[in-house]
Regions:
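Acidic, Ser/Thr/Pro-rich beta/coil linker or hinge segments at domain junctions
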Residues: 235-278
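Catalytic cores of secreted or luminal carbohydrate-active enzymes
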Residues: 121-138, 143-194, 285
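Carbohydrate-binding surface patches
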Residues: 195-235, 241, 284-287
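Flexible loop/turn segments at secondary-structure boundaries
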Residues: 18-23, 69-75, 140-146, 184-185, ...
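Conserved, mostly hydrophobic/aromatic
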Residues: 12, 47, 67, 134, ...
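Noncatalytic carbohydrate-binding groove/subsite architecture in carbohydrate-active enzymes
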Residues: 1-121, 127, 180-195
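Generic recognition of flexible, low-complexity loop/linker segments
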Residues: 1, 50-54, 120-123, 133, ...
Length: 293
């Protein structure tokens, strides 16, 4: 496509949905969710290389990652086979109706899915020179970021991951170097086995004019906090820890408990000396104010 039609193309689209087997254990579903963004990073890297190699005249064709998510499909979840006689809206309506009849129409993202979204955002930040647009479907209900009903509305874990990165990040991505213990996972669902995955996944953004640096840290360990030492190459005058967390990986918000998962902000006494601890199964934006040189 890049070679034949590259001069006419503004973006090339990538999609990825991570999906476990229907009988997958909770552990397998957890590790699929927190490693799927690494697979997305691999796909972006391969696509970047292919596009750059074949685009005409060295043209930079950016990537639009306009469909992505993680799906936890239970064996009882309805299967709707696409039919050429149905429109997309008719197909979705039938899918929703069957799901509601079986009580499984809403995925209702858990904390681990919020980590999936945060990890995906970190992948985008590390590829900000190539990935210029990304969209998420859907916004409300079914597989939405927001759940609504007669009792009101609440934001899911993925909603709060969006909120964390929208409100606590800078306009410019910067490179980081991470030294972290690693883990490996077996092949699950549509994802291959992976080795050497760091428990700590980190990206960074900055606002030079405000002398602000944000470290976007995801602790993928489901049970253990991790203490880290941070070197930003400058003095730190203030640190605020913005944390997305909950009681456990499968904690969910609900109409009766809409803030079981939420973003909290804590001003720290820590200003760079000594280790800083990131809770198990959490996503953080560590907001640092840097000293004048």
């Amino acid at each position: 496509v890049a070679r034949i039609a590259g001069e006419h193309i503004d973006n090339i689209t990538l999609h990825h949905y991570a999906q476990a087997d229907e009988d997958a254990s909770r552990d397998d579903q957890y590790w699929l969710a927190v490693t799927a963004p690494s697979r997305i990073g691999d796909l972006i890297a391969m696509s970047r290389a292919t596009i750059d190699a074949h685009a005409p005249g060295g043209k930079r064709i950016p990537i639009s990652f306009d469909e992505w998510n993680v799906i936890h499909r239970h064996a009882k979840y309805p299967r709707v086979i696409a039919n050429g006689d149905w429109s997309a809206l008719e197909h979705q309506a039938l899918f929703t109706t069957l799901g509601e009849q079986m009580g499984v129409a809403h995925q209702d993202y858990a904390l681990v899915d919020g980590l999936y979204a945060a990890l995906f955002f970190n992948v985008l930040l590390r590829n900000a020179d190539h990935v210029t647009m990304a969209n998420q479907a859907q916004l409300v209900n079914l597989f939405g970021l927001i759940e609504t009903g007669p009792a009101g509305a609440y934001g899911t874990a993925e909603y709060h991951a969006f909120r964390l990165y929208v409100e606590q990040s800078g306009p410019t991505a910067v490179a980081v170097r991470v030294d972290s213990p690693t883990f490996e996972v077996r092949a699950t669902g549509n994802l291959p086995a992976r080795q050497g995955e760091p428990y700590l996944d980190v990206a960074a953004t900055q606002d030079i004019e405000r002398r602000k640096l944000w470290l976007h840290v995801v602790n993928r360990h489901p049970r253990e906090e991790i203490a880290v030492r941070i070197d930003v190459g400058a003095g730190i005058t203030e640190a605020v820890h913005h944390l997305l967390g909950g009681r456990g990986p499968w904690t969910r918000n609900s109409f009766t408990d809409p803030e079981a998962i939420a973003v909290s902000s804590t001003h720290l006494d820590w200003v760079g000396a000594g280790p800083l601890t990131f809770p198990a199964c959490s996503a953080s934006s560590l907001e640092l104010t840097l000293a004048e040189p």
